[in-house]
């Protein structure tokens, strides 16, 4: 697609360019997704995750902007794979935007067919929060990554990663959270990436501490800090599919090993062994079929090394990029011998309706976020783990684009927080409305058998009714915009998922919508896990009064 060099930045303050705050919020969040501080390749409309875009092409982007500027308070804009296709009369409590991105009929749900359609200009890849306009930069995945490594520490290392070394790879928009998440848990991490720009970006934003091109130097620093039991993160330039086998050959085994390279997309994401970023780009253009095959062969080597490390005692887990599936398809029959991060560490949180809840200050004023931090510290003071997160985030997380915050809140907590935020906007404590949203990676909004719904207790991993029901209930309850996507995180054919965003503009109507949406949305997570037979979900549903007709 054509590259357009222009700097897009969301407006700040209280002056509207649209006919209402919900439309304004959608416009600012679309533009914020493409802010150079936030997006990975804004000139190509790519936000994160290989080719995860905010709009299909530049013509569609400008048409969306124009549509949002003229959209009435009782109209709904429909967006099909990043292209605005209709505006219908609806009503004031309806979503202002409905988005469907990258969805394919199952028999045709593969990368080859997607790329044919993309080439014809008929489709785009929306990832999760790229095409649904609620990406907030690397902070968006940071607490989830912090929670994952924290749970690994609780299960295997007496509650802290002090004195441990983690080896991982992939420092893009998602994987870039890993170095800081490990050091927040007290550990040492060597994070590998083949693209120097990705490492530089994480260092610039204080997500990573040091840069090196030398494996020897990385190991020396890691060992020094491991001995001192002090945290440090080292960005190592190289290809994990070369470096991990080399470590296995030398019998250098880390305490933990995982991976967040863009393995979900063998063509536009992963870079094969032996190629620089520039050489890979040339091969991708000249011979895409050979590129994909080389990528898949490299992924197989990568997973073989992870399995070898697991055999030698490393705590090993898949971080949701579908690399095990590719290795399995390439003939590595034991590729799934190490678990995914959700069944290993996160599912109990999902059973309580917990997930990555985020909010953004449309004012552009960091003080608005700091005031909301104080709300969390006051209202949820009994949750020491959550409060520790907020305190660390304030100190260590640099905002990208509009100021924002993320934390994991559960059923009941999200609605309570939303009510308070809306009241703060109403009484002027906050200088402009707040956008409340979440990742599609949530407790009740995704079907992804190699990630969020891997190894479900009842075998319902591939049942995709749940994200559809999630989107439907959020729409009728008045979310500001709702999205249904395919292929996020793990690639074409492997996931369906839904997103929602709601705007706290201080009005009484918003208060009612917030109460409904922020109850039903996490409620779907509780319901989904009750249905699968999880005792903790049943206990949560009974304690919180979630109405589930056939619950025993």
Curated annotation (Swiss-Prot):
Binds 1 NAD(+) per subunit. GO terms for cellular component: cytoplasm. This is Urocanate hydratase. Belongs to the urocanase family. Its cofactor is NAD(+). It is found in: Cytoplasm. Its EC number is 4.2.1.49. Pathway: Amino-acid degradation; L-histidine degradation into L-glutamate; N-formimidoyl-L-glutamate from L-histidine: step 2/3. Gene3D superfamilies: Urocanase like domains, Urocanase superfamily. It comes from Bacillus mycoides (strain KBAB4) (Bacillus weihenstephanensis). The keyword Cytoplasm applies. It catalyses: 4-imidazolone-5-propanoate = trans-urocanate + H2O. The gene is hutU. The active site is at residue 407. Pfam families: Urocanase, Urocanase_C, Urocanase_N. It comes from the Bacteria. One of its GO terms (molecular function) is urocanate hydratase activity. Keywords: Cytoplasm, Histidine metabolism, Lyase, NAD. Catalyzes the conversion of urocanate to 4-imidazolone-5-propionate. NAD(+) binds at residues 49-50, 127, 173-175, 193, 239-240, 260-264, 270-271, 319, 489. GO terms for biological process: L-histidine catabolic process to glutamate and formamide; L-histidine catabolic process to glutamate and formate.
């Amino acid at each position: 697609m054509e590259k357009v060099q222009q700097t897009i930045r969301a407006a700040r303050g209280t002056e509207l360019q649209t006919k209402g705050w919900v439309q304004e919020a959608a416009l600012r969040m679309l533009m914020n997704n493409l802010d150079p501080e936030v997006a990975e390749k804004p000139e190509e409309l790519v936000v994160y995750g290989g080719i995860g875009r905010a709009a299909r092409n530049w013509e569609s982007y400008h048409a969306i902007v124009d549509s949002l500027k003229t959209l009435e308070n009782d109209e709904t804009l429909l967006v099909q794979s990043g292209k605005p296709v209709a505006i219908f009369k609806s009503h004031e409590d309806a979503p202002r935007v409905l988005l469907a991105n990258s969805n394919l009929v199952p028999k045709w749900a593969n990368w080859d067919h997607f790329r044919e359609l993309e080439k014809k200009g008929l489709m785009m890849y929306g990832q999760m929060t790229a095409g649904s306009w609620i990406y907030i930069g690397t902070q968006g995945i940071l607490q989830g990554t912090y929670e994952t490594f924290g749970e690994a520490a609780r299960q295997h290392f007496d509650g802290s990663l002090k004195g441990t070394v983690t080896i991982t790879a992939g420092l893009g928009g998602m994987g870039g959270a890993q170095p800081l998440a490990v050091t927040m848990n007290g550990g040492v991490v060597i994070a590998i990436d083949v693209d120097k720009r990705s490492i530089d970006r994480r260092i610039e934003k204080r997500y990573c501490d040091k840069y090196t091109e030398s494996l020897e130097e990385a190991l020396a620093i890691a060992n020094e800090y491991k001995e001192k039991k002090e945290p440090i993160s080292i960005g190592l330039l190289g290809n994990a599919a070369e470096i991990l086998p080399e470590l296995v050959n030398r019998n250098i085994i880390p305490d933990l090993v995982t991976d967040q390279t863009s393995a979900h997309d063998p063509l536009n994401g992963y870079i094969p062994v032996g190629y620089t970023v520039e050489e890979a780009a040339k091969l991708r253009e000249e011979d895409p079929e050979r590129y994909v095959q080389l990528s898949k062969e490299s992924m197989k080597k990568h997973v073989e090394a992870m399995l070898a490390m697991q055999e030698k005692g490393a705590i090993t887990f898949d971080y949701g990029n579908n690399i095990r599936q590719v290795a399995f398809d390439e003939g590595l029959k034991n590729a799934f011998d190490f678990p995914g991060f959700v069944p290993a560490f996160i599912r109990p949180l999902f059973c309580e309706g917990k997930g990555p809840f985020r909010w953004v200050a449309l004012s552009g004023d960091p003080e608005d976020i700091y005031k909301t931090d104080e709300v969390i510290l006051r209202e949820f003071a009994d949750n020491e783990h959550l409060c520790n997160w907020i305190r660390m985030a304030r100190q260590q997380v640099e905002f990208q684009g509009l100021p924002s915050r993320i934390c994991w809140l559960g059923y009941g907590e999200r609605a309570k927080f939303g009510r308070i935020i809306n009241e703060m906007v109403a009484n002027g404590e906050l200088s402009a409305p707040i956008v409340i949203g979440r990742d599609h990676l949530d407790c009740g909004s995704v079907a992804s058998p190699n990630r969020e719904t891997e190894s479900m207790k009842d075998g319902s991993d591939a049942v995709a009714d749940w994200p559809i029901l999630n989107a439907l209930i959020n729409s009728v309850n008045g979310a500001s915009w709702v999205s249904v996507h395919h292929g996020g995180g793990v690639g074409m054919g492997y996931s369906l998922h839904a997103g929602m965003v709601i705007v706290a503009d201080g009005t009484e109507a918003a208060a009612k919508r917030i109460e409904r949406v922020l109850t039903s949305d996490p409620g779907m997570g509780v319901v989904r896990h009750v249905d699968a037979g999880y005792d903790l979900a049943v206990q949560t549903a009974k304690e919180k009064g979630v109405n589930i007709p056939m619950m025993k």
